């Protein structure tokens, strides 16, 4: 008589809450493997405590002078730094508190973030700390969305604060898959598409200048433009050796690389004006192949609230402008997102300009 293997993923119960005497520590980063990183320099988390049923407090430290960094000159933090911090959080909580085995792949389904416009957490601490490492606390609530023998789904809601001041919120939904199931799902997603040329960009493509996407150097530029293409059409310029976006080997285009490309695309469409992205709601549909071109398209949406509307609520920022951004490979949509952003002329009302 044959017997089936025991279920790998059960309706797990999180570990018991920590002692009231235990306080979050910001002293030492977690081991890289705890958040699926290869380099210790790319780890933001320093501690995590359970404070209730499926409720956690997580400590992180953001360092300056790095890609995906907080700006020490008083501008709002890069939203993707917050997203990456929460991505590391969902991985660590899944392993440490919910018993998900190491080596089981995580698949991101959707995410949403909102930055509180005008909040500048790097300015809220004492003078000597400004421009230095920034201690961040996440108030996290997890919700289990389903479990089968080879699949475990969860959702997360995280509110980020510095010195008790809220500055953003992130929601994510993901699944952990048994390695065998992941291999099956991954193989099914492989599509016949034209290969990407190796080496230099094709002659018809021009890599964007760093200033078009908010950087001083071209090391971080992820977009190229067809010389005959429309304003909002770009190609992903993959950088497999990038120490942050490709910290460890992957069999697909990373979600963080695509989100950073989306942010750059919105900035490029608004150039020379510098857009500030404050909202994004993205759905991940399928895996992107590493050896085939990825097109990034920006479709402008609403222009946000008018100045007269803003005058009716002088202590609040204008509503953001919006754009629909998609990443396509062949005939498959990899990711689609609605992005909310402000241009400099929008940031002249209320607390945004303070």
Question: PLM ranges: what are they?
Answer:
Residues 226-293:
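Intrinsically disordered, low-complexity segments enriched in Gly and acidic/Ser/Thr residues
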